Regions:
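Metal-cofactor-binding active-site regions of metalloenzymes
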Residues: 1-191, 198-204, 210-219, 223-240
């Protein structure tokens, strides 16, 4: 059965590019870019992933991405992921990326997206892995910042399939970003939002994502199982979780 599953062609519809950065690569880029890390070894980074809650996970997630500085860094991050995906016979991917996590550190939006999309093109040609990119907004940043980054993305709309929403959900409900997502839909982009597991007001947030934002997909959303009417609405709309 393991061999059968390994040989199956696959699609990956939920992967955070920055989250695919491997510990050894973190240290390699930190040394190259002169970035000081709070971890003294790749093994310490791995140990930090023994987290208890979403904020603890996000702490290590953002610490890792700080080593990404140049266009080549983003290229290597992305292409190395595609190499691993190809080894698992993944044929199509819709990866997320978090531009605010980089522009807030002084890395230009163009640097980020050019490195990622160059790797996408090479992976399609060399590895047979096709992909379309989803730009995520960080929900613990302001709606104004999200709108600014949507405007930054306007020259690159042909490189995106959609927009998403991730990061810490506490006090950051989906409707905080309703206007941003409405604008993205006007521009022809698909919509998805994270509704992580067992977060504050999770079920009501999923209702808002489904019926008010009218997203095309819900990331995670497993707490919908607590509400039969919500499950029925998701089925009626044909949404993927």
């Amino acid at each position: 059965m393991t061999d059968f599953i390994a040989a199956m062609p696959k699609a990956e519809l939920h992967v955070h590019l920055e989250g695919t950065l491997e510990p050894e690569h973190i240290f390699e880029l930190a040394q190259k870019n002169g970035i000081e890390l709070e971890y003294d070894s790749p093994e310490a980074v791995i140990a930090a992933y023994d987290f208890d809650d979403l904020p603890s996970f996000l702490k290590i997630y953002y610490a890792g991405m700080n080593v990404l500085i140049t266009e080549q860094d983003f290229y290597e991050l992305t292409y190395r992921y595609f190499e691993r995906a190809a080894a698992d016979n993944v044929r199509y991917v819709e990866p997320f990326f978090d531009p605010q996590g980089h522009t807030s550190r002084g890395v230009a939006f163009k640097t980020v997206i050019d490195g990622i999309t160059r790797a996408q093109a090479d992976a399609a040609e060399n590895l047979g892995v096709r992909s379309r990119l989803i730009m995520c907004f960080l929900r613990d940043m302001s709606a104004e910042s999200a709108m600014e980054h949507l405007e930054m993305a306007k020259p690159y709309l042909d490189r995106l399939i959609g927009v998403g929403l991730d990061s810490d959900e506490k006090d950051n409900p989906p409707l905080k970003f309703a206007d941003v997502f409405a604008k993205a839909r006007e521009w022809g982009l698909k919509l998805t939002m994270h509704c992580d597991v067992d977060q504050e007001n999770t079920v009501s947030n999923i209702w808002d994502v489904v019926t008010k934002v009218e997203a095309d997909r819900v990331d995670h959303g497993v707490n919908s199982l607590e509400d039969e009417a919500l499950c029925a609405e998701i089925v009626t709309r044909g949404l993927g979780l």
